Amino acid sequence: MQLKIFLFKLLFLIFFSFSFNNFAFGFFFNNRYDSNFFIDKKYTKDFIFFKKNECFSFLKYKKNFFLNKKIIIGNNHFIGFFQKNRFKIFYIVKSKDTMYSIAKNSGYNYHELSKFNSIKKPYKIIIGQKIWMGDFLIDKNNNDCSILNLEKNSIKQHNSCEVVFKNLLNIEKFLKDNIKTKKICFFCIKKIKKNNNSLKLKFFNFSNNWSWPVKNKNTKYFYIDKLGNKRIEIIGFKGQPVFSTAAGEVVFVTNLFKKYGLLIIIKHDQNYLSIYAFNNSVLVKEKDRVYKNQQIATMGLSSDTNLARLYFEIRYLGESINPLSILPKINTNI
């Protein structure tokens, strides 16, 4: 009788162990290849900010039976997970988001962003999906991260992130006492200054390699700077030739965005992109190499005015810049 009981218990333990391992393995396997899972990359890249700074609330100090403890932070745009000495930052996909729109707003090439997140053509994403945007390093040598105190009567309004996150005991104590009354803020003032200096240098060295995308004796155009989108809209006639302003590779051709009609994006040397919209027809395809002044499209009608014009934009390192600072000088505008 005792032998039977022993064998029964042994079989039960074997069955339980097998079931647990399958469940744990299935949990890991399913989540490892889901872009919503916390991705542990072999490489890292710096987080590019939407604004000059990003502040996050502490959402949880999460304990999971299968995973290690996680510090989770979040705001309206991003969610972050703490690992070792850095926060891995993810964008939360919202309604009407596309990989292109996310990449454009965050300063990335959408091919690069898709590659980082193992998202392949046709680049389908779903609401709530997490797109890895980069890492923010907690570094004692940089004063670019602070813990802000939300309590009005507090004597000390902020603390260094490095002090709080330098060891696990500090983190546990801090979050146990302060998770609802503190925010963590990342600052990128130094990075912005550095980028501005490099922009001026690149403009100076690169300006002679560009030409206007429309060839008119008297070119008429509007310069528009709206919500950080710097562009010119060149007036012409429907079917008028549109030319590549510099040599490069066609990286995007689409008609998915009704506001822009047929859209072309060309990647140039030194991290520049040129964008052509409101096209009536397109004469190139993705991955085509184009040369300066090669015809790539014909002019169409803008979506809002129904008048013939070309939407033209230049981006450097994903940031919209004034095309007039690069294109050869002309005398005529509106």
Curated annotation (Swiss-Prot):
GO terms for molecular function: metalloendopeptidase activity. Pfam families: LysM (PF01476), Peptidase_M23 (PF01551). SUPFAM superfamilies: Duplicated hybrid motif. SMART domains: LysM (SM00257). Residues 89-133 form the LysM domain. GO terms for cellular component: cell division site; cell outer membrane. It comes from the Bacteria. InterPro entries: Cell_wall_metabolism_enzyme, Dup_hybrid_motif, LysM_dom, LysM_dom_sf, Peptidase_M23. Belongs to the E.coli NlpD/Haemophilus LppB family. This is Protein NlpD/LppB homolog.
